[in-house]
Amino acid sequence: MDIETSGRVVRFHRPAVEWPTVGLSLVIFGGWGALTFWHAIIPWPLLTLGGGWFVAWHMSLQHEVLHGHPTRHRRVNDAIGFPPLTLWLPYMIYRRNHLRHHRNEHLTDPLEDPETYYLTPERFGRLGPAARAFLRFRNTFFGRITFGAWRGMALFLWVHLGLCLRGNRAELRIWAPHLVGVAVVLAWVCGVCHMSLWMYVLCFVIPSRSLASIRSFAEH
């Protein structure tokens, strides 16, 4: 790979396998597996912190693998990103939407960013006082990690499951394997580890979305 910097072309040789990222993947899956397996002896505040951390960490790892890491083989990378530890977010939808955002001329346009919270002054001005107050709260740090996180999950499911119910074949082709993956995750969590679904959602899924919202708060 050739990279141009300050008028000079620097040749960069990318390794066939980026072993630090492979090692990080093992840490993430191992940590998640350990927390779920021994959840009964872990105080719930620590379980919530650790569960949210490892699932959010996997979401960050998904961002790396969709950009071609840690190997040169897409199928291997996708296999690392695919496991639906969040339950609600299909990796292939995240991959499709994120790469679509990177492949157009609107990369830095806040209105086109799939993670944007931006409203034009004209649109904001048409809102009533209550709506403006709510949006100001949502754009605070606390608002992002609480209501913003929950709203994001609910809105995502509303839109994409609605497409499935209307027979959108592209969505169905993504959600079918995703639901199989969810079944495997829950077979481990509920069947092997004997953790209730509600505990997994409260201690892993929701906290991970809140942690992931911190990045979007800093960027948007």
Label the predicted regions.
Residues V76-P83:
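Select transmembrane alpha-helical segments in multipass membrane proteins
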